[in-house]
């Protein structure tokens, strides 16, 4: 699509790709600090992306040297069967109508599937004026590509930025971009004094220590197992059903994962991606996932049987297990 074209901004140029196979050889070297921009993860998106998503990969060059990489995603909300079924009030119905009819073709500069600043990474310091130019120009070029196909992009979103980055970008071409906050990126810092789960629990107030004990007691009979690739394949249908229940009942959703997403991610990322199954009487009733991102352990998607969740405080126990 863009194989013969490179867009230049002063000394910095960028090139847009629509296939992981086309990416420069040094892509992963540049993206080494963020797994969500590495080819192992991008290949997962390419092989098991949501049915309504198309991905684009942006290489940023200084002369001929690759110094930055970025991700863009196009979503066709017309292909989405539900925006989320938890809230059924009148305002939600109006919101869904507006999205379906006036914002159905949406372009994200960044990763719409996760929270956190995972939209771009550089090997050297680049001023925010240049970053804003690259992101805006990339969005314009991808928008033009779809326009030539007869598809009008209704909404362009740039996500996510830490506050100090947002402040700097607003000084330049982002000055006219509407800024909004949505679901937060929750960060849990581990105290270096904590060497065991007991140390963590001991640091809690009495209220939350009691909650921990109550949740653990409710979890009796649940067996947690780190699933191998073969086991993920074996339980793939159940894993997806558990995920789909949680996703469908979220207050708002713009995509649903493909059924083979978790097995593809396990195959591509190996031990960096962990999927923990929760079994009751040998039946899989829940799962949570973790992905090692440099020195950060990222929580990914999860799923559970709602009846077991209520009775056994499954979700809360998953959160506790993630701290181990």
Please state what every model-predicted region is:
Residues 2, 6-89, 154-310:
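A conserved beta-strand-loop-helix scaffold within acyl/acetyltransferase catalytic domains
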Residues 54-55, 77-176, 296-324:
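Acyl-donor binding region in acyl/amide transferases
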């Amino acid at each position: 699509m863009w194989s013969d074209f490179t867009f230049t901004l002063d000394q910095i140029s960028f090139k847009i790709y629509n296939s992981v196979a086309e990416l420069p050889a040094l892509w992963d070297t540049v993206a080494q600090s963020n797994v969500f921009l590495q080819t192992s993860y991008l290949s997962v998106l390419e092989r098991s992306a949501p049915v309504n998503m198309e991905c684009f990969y942006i290489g940023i060059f200084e002369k001929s040297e690759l110094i930055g990489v970025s991700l863009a995603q196009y979503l066709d909300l017309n292909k989405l069967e539900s925006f989320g079924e938890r809230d059924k009030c009148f305002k939600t119905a109006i919101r869904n109508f507006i999205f379906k009819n006036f914002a159905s073709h949406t372009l994200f500069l960044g990763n719409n599937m996760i929270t956190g600043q995972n939209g771009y990474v550089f090997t050297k310091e680049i001023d925010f004026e240049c970053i804003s130019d690259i992101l805006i120009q990339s969005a314009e070029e991808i928008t033009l590509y779809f326009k030539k196909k007869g598809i009008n992009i209704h909404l362009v979103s740039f996500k996510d930025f830490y506050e100090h980055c947002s402040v700097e970008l607003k000084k330049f071409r982002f000055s006219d971009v509407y800024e909004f906050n949505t679901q937060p990126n929750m960060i849990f810092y581990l105290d270096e004094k904590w060497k065991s789960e007991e140390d963590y629990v001991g640091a809690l107030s009495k209220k939350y220590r009691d909650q921990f004990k109550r949740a653990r007691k409710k979890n009796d009979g649940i067996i947690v197992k780190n699933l191998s690739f073969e086991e993920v394949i074996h339980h793939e249908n159940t894993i997806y059903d558990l995920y789909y229940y949680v996703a469908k009942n979220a207050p708002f959703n713009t995509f649903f994962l493909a059924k083979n997403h978790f097995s593809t991610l396990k195959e591509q990322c190996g031990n960096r991606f962990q999927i923990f199954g929760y079994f009751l009487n040998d039946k899989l009733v829940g799962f949570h996932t973790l992905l090692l991102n440099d020195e950060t352990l990222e929580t990914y998607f999860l799923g559970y049987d709602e009846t077991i969740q209520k009775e056994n405080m499954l979700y809360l126990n998953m959160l506790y297990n993630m701290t181990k």
